[in-house]
Amino acid sequence: MSTATGAPNASAAPAPSAAPAPSAAPAPLSTPATTAADAATPASPGTGGGFARRSRALGWRLRFAVLSLIWGFSFLFIKVGTQGFAPLQVTLGRVTFGALVLMVILLVKRERLPRSARTWGHLAVAAFLLNALPFSLFAYSELTIPSTLAGICNATSPLWGMVLSVVALSEDRPTRRRVAGLGIGFLGVLTVLGAWQGFAGTDLTGTAMALGASLSYPIGWIYVRRTLAGASHSHLAMSSTQLLLAAAQLAVVTPLFTTAPTGLPLVPLLAVFALGALGTGFAFLLQYGLVAEVGPTTAQMVTYFVPVIATAAGVALLDENLSWNTPLGALIILAGAALTQSRPRPATTPSPTTIPSSAAQRR
C-alpha cells in the first residue's frame, strides 16, 4: 500500500493503497514481461544500447528524486494548508483531489472499480486506517508542532511495522539485526524529543498525534495483507476506490466538527491542492512505476529521503527552528528503520559438480 507520504516499509507489504506516507510498502509488482520479440532481439552493439540503458537509468532516478521531493514537501503543504483551513478540511481536500487524479487516470485507462461488496468493505477499513485517520492526525499535529518534526515522526512507521508484524504475522519473525534496529530507532525518537531534558520545549500532544499517524499505517498494511492480498483488481482500481471511500468518510465527519470556511485563501488552497493532486494522486503513479521498473527494494529507499527533505523545506521555507538533537535523532531513526527492513542474504550452496571460482571463494 502506498501512503500519502510514503515511503515503503518491507515489514508488511500488501496490495497497494492510495498514495503517502512515506513509509508504506508497495506490494511488489510484476516487472513488465519481456515479449518474444524482445527476447529474440539482441541489444544493439555500440553506443545505441548503452545510450538506452543510460536513459532508462536517468529516467527512474529522476522519478525517484521527484517522488522524494513530493512526499518530503507534503508536511510543508499540511502546515500551510492548516493556516487557512481546519485540519479535517485539509484532509478532506487532500483525499478528494487525490481521488480525482486517480479517477481521471482510471477513466483514461478504461479500468473499472471493484464490484464486490466484500472488497469495498475491506477497502473502507483500509481507507480509515491508511488515509482518513493518519492524514487527519498529521494535520492536527502540525497545529502545534513544526512540519520538520512531523516528517521525522513519519519515519518511525517501519519501526511500528516491525513490532506489529511480529505480533500479527506469524511468518515474519524478528532477527537480532531487526531487533537491534528497533532499539536504535526508538533511541532516535527519544533523541528528537530531547528526553534527557524532560521533553522541554516539545508539544507532547502534537508529537503523540504524529506518532499515532505513523502507527496507523502499519496497522492498515497488516489489515490489508490479511484481507485483500491476492485481489484480482489492479492497484489503480483498488487505490481509487480506497480514496473515494476516505473522501466519503471525511465528507460525513468534517461538517460535524468544523464550520464552513469564510473564504478560500489562495496559498492554503494551493497547498491543499498540491498535497492531494501531487502527494496523494500523482505520487501513486510514480511509486508504482518505480516498483515495476527497479523493484520494491530500490523503490522503498525513498523512505530515507523524505524526512531529510521535510526538514530542509521546513527550515528554509517556513523558517522553523532546528535544534541539534532533531537532525541527529532523525539520522538515528533512519538507521534503525534501515536495520528493521534488512533481510539476510540467502546462503548459496555451490553445485557439487562445480568448483567455486576464486572470486566466489573471496565472497
Model-derived segments and spans:
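Juxtamembrane helix-loop-helix junctions in multi-pass membrane proteins
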Residues: 69-99, 140, 146-152, 219-245
